[in-house]
Amino acid sequence: NSALERLVDAYTSSAVHLLMQRDMDAVAEAGRSPPASSPPRPLPKLRRSRSGSATELLQYVHAPLHVATRPSGWTQFRILSVRTWSNLVRNPMLMMAHMLLACVLGAVCGLLFHQLTNDIAGFQNRFGLFFFTLLTFGFSCLSLLTTFAEEREVFARERANRYYAATPYFASKALFDVLPLRVVPPFLFGSIVYALVGLTPTLAAFWRMILVLVLFTLASSACVFCIGVGIAHTSVASMVSTLTMLASLLFAGLLVNREQLPPAVRWLQHLSFFHAALEALVVNELRGLSLRERKYGVDIEIPAATIISSFGFDAQAFWIPDVLTLVLHTLAFSALALGFLTWPVSYTHLRAHETSLH
């Protein structure tokens, strides 16, 4: 005989097996006994074996049935937040890369656009600085696609088993994954570049610039996350995200003048978060600036608001509609992503339930 067969034979002839068999027979007999009129015959008291397996089994069978209740939304959010933060800490290179990129780009832009002048060249350099900044932070949000792609199977399995709802998961991802990587880098970049470039030297203008950069990054992140959740294939989601960014960039206002657009497509600028952010940054910096240019021995002074208007921007727009547009884009894409997180898993769970019934 093999070692496994000898082990089985030894267990079959052991006292532990005999006690276990007797306990199981007693439990089965108690289940078949008639209810109501006479109370069920109590099970015989068994001598506790050395392993204690038989007695522990009986205690488990006679113990009150505890039905596990689903934890509250706050408990789900707290547990998922701890897990999300732990995953972020275990992979510090991603956070360090975002922080280092923001600092390096801030230093490079500070050197390239050092102490801008109040002339036409300085006006052009300000436009270039803001456009490059939005381009950098917008396309850096594409890294969100791989973040959710790595968790898609785990999320689908856990949601199908009803471990947690979609809202706590989305909130934990937004608070402990999106915010550290999308809020801190714009603040670092803006803090470095603002003084080096020589932008408007007021505290209010500085914080307005930081606000616009943060809101733009959040809107871009929400857009990319929404596409990543809605499209299962990472390569397709990456292509759609890139095309969406380019389309929004096309209507930003620098590549195509709004006044030269056909009326049928002019409304598309209102769907461009690049346009809202660029217009807000330009208005915040240049609205009260006067440009002085000396050409052919003649000094010319031009209000920057006039040139802003010639580019198709609204010199009075900042809070409304630009900042409001960024907030609405963030909320709309977040709500759509939450809907994508909820609907497919619920549908899969429903189909699995119907299959099990049949």
Segments from the language model and where they lie:
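Interhelical loop segments of eukaryotic multi-pass membrane proteins
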Residues: 117-129, 154-162, 241-244, 266-269, ...
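Topological signature of polytopic alpha-helical transporters
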Residues: 1-90, 98-110, 114, 246, ...
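Alpha-helical transmembrane segments and their short interhelical loops
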Residues: 110, 166-168, 172, 176-258, ...
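Juxtamembrane membrane-interface segments at transmembrane-helix boundaries in membrane proteins
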Residues: 85-86, 119-133, 201-211, 304-325
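A short, hydrophobic C-terminal helix/tail in secreted or cell-surface proteins
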Residues: 352-358
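Long, hydrophobic alpha-helical segments
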Residues: 109, 127-147
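Transmembrane helix boundary and interhelical loop/hinge segments in multi-pass membrane proteins
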Residues: 141-162, 166-167
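Short alpha-helical transmembrane interface motifs in multi-pass membrane proteins
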Residues: 66-67, 135-141, 205-209
